[in-house]
């Protein structure tokens, strides 16, 4: 009884081409400038084998280039190759975005040395020592709305005498909020117009 112990032939490690390959190792790219001579046959298996051979040659020369030109480091996790920076410029679909002009607040904060609030400072929570619990600073059941729903509200007789007819102390807060929102929207539109004018001058 005989057994077939033949092994597939080892493919060559070196690849010779009329025109040398060019490389961009930073992108793991090997460019083959040589034309691909596709065999004139309708047998798809022959075509696939030929294209696989061309692809194999490209992969082999890329591996050879990596092993001979890059820095190789042995670590406990294995062998590491340090790739150089890419050299192939990649085209952009869109133009490079222009830097946004400073808003009025950003310019003011830069002049005064005001730093952005930290994440802790932006938290919408504060400790209420009276109740011993954490509560929201604003929003639903926020501390800034404390007293608005109390059944009895302390008022000043002098201020009540000067109050416009048809208004009540309970509506003051809502009117203040609406006026502040309207003012902020007006200021935002003004800042957007100024920013657009600055962008148009560049």
Swiss-Prot record:
Pfam families per UniProt: RRS1 (PF04939)
Keywords for the protein's UniProt record, in alphabetical order: Nucleus, Ribosome biogenesis
One annotated GO biological process: ribosome biogenesis
Annotated signal peptide: none
UniProt superkingdom: Eukaryota
Cellular component, GO, one term: nucleus
Compartments (UniProt record): Nucleus
Region (Disordered): 82-103
Family, as annotated: Belongs to the RRS1 family.
Free-text function comment from the UniProt entry: Involved in ribosomal large subunit assembly.
Subunit details: Component of a hexameric 5S RNP precursor complex, composed of 5S RNA, RRS1, RPF2, RPL5, RPL11 and SYO1; this complex acts as a precursor for ribosome assembly.
Protein name: Ribosome biogenesis regulatory protein homolog
Protein source organism: Chaetomium thermophilum (strain DSM 1495 / CBS 144.50 / IMI 039719) (Thermochaetoides thermophila)
Native organism taxonomy: Eukaryota, Fungi, Dikarya, Ascomycota, Pezizomycotina
């Amino acid at each position: 009884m005989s057994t077939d112990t033949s092994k597939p032939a080892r493919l060559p490690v070196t690849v010779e081409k009329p025109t040398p390959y060019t490389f961009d190792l930073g992108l793991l790219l090997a460019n083959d400038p040589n034309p691909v001579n596709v065999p004139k046959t309708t047998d798809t298996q022959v075509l696939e084998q030929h294209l696989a051979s061309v692809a194999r040659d490209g992969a082999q020369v890329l591996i050879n280039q990596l092993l001979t030109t890059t820095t190789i480091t042995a670590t406990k996790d294995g062998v590491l190759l340090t790739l150089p920076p890419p050299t192939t410029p990649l085209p952009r679909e869109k133009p490079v975005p222009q830097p946004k002009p400073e808003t009025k607040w950003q310019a003011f904060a830069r002049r005064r040395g005001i730093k952005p609030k930290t994440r802790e400072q932006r938290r919408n929570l504060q400790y209420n020592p009276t109740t011993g619990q954490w509560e929201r600073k604003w929003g639903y059941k926020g501390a800034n709305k404390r007293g608005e729903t109390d059944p009895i509200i302390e008022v000043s007789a002098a201020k009540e005498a000067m109050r416009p007819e048809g208004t009540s102390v309970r509506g003051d807060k809502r009117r203040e909020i609406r006026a502040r929102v309207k003012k902020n929207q007006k200021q935002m539109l003004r800042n957007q117009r100024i920013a657009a004018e600055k962008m148009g001058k560049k």
